[in-house]
From Swiss-Prot:
GO biological process: translation
MF-aspect GO terms: structural constituent of ribosome
Region of interest: Disordered: 1-22
Gene name per UniProt: rpl34e
HAMAP family assigned to the protein according to its UniProt record, in alphabetical order: Ribosomal_eL34 (MF_00349)
Similarity-based family: Belongs to the eukaryotic ribosomal protein eL34 family.
PANTHER family recorded: 60S RIBOSOMAL PROTEIN L34
KW Ribosomal protein (keyword) present: yes
UniProt-listed Pfam families: Ribosomal_L34e
GO CC list: ribonucleoprotein complex; ribosome
Keywords annotated in UniProt: Ribonucleoprotein, Ribosomal protein
Gene3D superfamilies reported in the protein's UniProt record: 6.20.340.10
InterPro entries: Ribosomal_eL34, Ribosomal_eL34_C_sf, Ribosomal_L34e_arc-type
Name of the protein: Large ribosomal subunit protein eL34
Length: 89
């Protein structure tokens, strides 16, 4: 029976062979899903893939791109939005 901390859905089972040809189970943390654009759903470049604990240890400039809506929208959607706002202004 696994320990309660391993029964979570955030743990991933990894089967390993031990000496003597016995199979044992190791538990690993699952990787976080990649960041996606809020408007079109495209994958965002320059945004790290990791748990919140790992990302807080990074420098500010490593967490997301240094531009308008960096880390939330892809460059194409930002450009479309700015052009639309400029035309309606």
């Amino acid at each position: 029976m696994p320990a309660p901390r391993y029964k979570s859905g955030s743990s991933k089972k990894v089967y390993r062979k031990a000496p003597g040809n016995s199979s044992i189970v190791h538990y690993r943390r699952k990787k976080q899903s990649k960041a996606v654009c809020g408007a079109c759903g495209a994958l965002l470049n320059g945004v790290p893939r990791g748990r919140a604990v790992e990302i807080t240890k990074l420098a500010k400039t490593e967490k997301r791109p240094e531009r308008a809506f960096g880390g939330n929208l892809c460059p194409k959607c930002v450009k479309k939005m700015m052009v639309a706002k400029a035309r309606n202004f």
